[in-house]
Amino acid sequence: MRPGFHRVAAMLLLLAVTAFAADKPQIFIGKVSDAMCGAQHMMAGASDADCTRACVKQGSKYALVVGDKVYTLEGGDAAALDKLAGQNAIISGTLKGKTITVASVAPAK
């Protein structure tokens, strides 16, 4: 075998395992918002929920604010996300970059 073959094989295996792990569903707990406002709602006189709904109606996507991070939500039950706008929720889904592909949505207790 050529020198370095084992190193290349190990690197490819590590990349494959990392890619597989990225597709594994995770649980996220945070506040349902929209991708435009994130954690800072800007609509004067409106609640966070009303601002979120207005922004989504204008074309923004739902988002989940977890600490200081804002994740855009793809897919999922739009009616459930609308109901939980401005509230804490438990989102199950796969994370890729800053986007969560939603598998399920539930209110946080």
Predicted regions and their residues:
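Conserved RNA-binding domains used in RNP assembly and mRNA/RNA metabolism
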Residues: V17-K109
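Bacterial N-terminal signal peptides that target proteins for export
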Residues: M1-A10
